[in-house]
């Protein structure tokens, strides 16, 4: 299934139902479209220790932010163009307010860190309040603005703490995320044995 909201909110029940039916639940399309990040996290990286995930996992918001960055469009102009081209829904709130990216962050985190992560535990901030001034200020700092989903396992006072979030982020212009144009997606996975892996492509 490509229904990321369903997987993120009812995952344990769905996996148990699949187990009882002696079948498998496939959900590669639920995160980052054609990019095989779910396959990697649930397969080749399963025996590794993932330390951090960072991703641009929503094509709608990336298209809007790219239009604001490269063409100087304001938020409403960029959103309208995204809708006209079919990259945004008539009601874009799930995308532009960060709900979609939060669900994908929860799914990737659940696969990576050995614990089920509820979508409600992922703090989120969307892009609806961003202005052309914000984009210009980022450019002055040598950065572009991207909506980034992030999950990191940290040591805090001797305890392993999972830090999660989805928010607009200043990304250095020479970072691979900065080169993702239009509705493209990208995910970076940092693991102890495998090192840093990049998954880039159409979302």
What is each PLM-predicted segment?
Residues 1-2, 8, 25-29, 52-55, ...:
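General beta-strand structural signal in soluble alpha/beta enzymes
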Residues 3-43:
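Rossmann-fold NAD(P)-binding glycine/threonine-rich loop
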Residues 37-50, 61-73, 103-117:
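Oxidoreductase and adenylate-handling cofactor-binding alpha/beta cores
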Residues 50-60, 127, 199-201:
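NAD(P)-dependent dehydrogenases' Rossmann-like dinucleotide-binding region
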Residues 51-52, 89-97, 199-202:
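A short glycine-threonine-serine/GTX helix/turn-capping micro-motif
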Residues 55-63, 97-101:
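Conserved phosphate/anionic-ligand binding catalytic regions in large, soluble enzymes, centered on
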Residues 68, 77-179, 184-186:
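Substrate-binding/catalytic subdomain of NAD(P)-dependent oxidoreductase enzymes
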Residues 178-192, 196-203:
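Gly/His-enriched, cation/cofactor- and phosphate-binding structural elements
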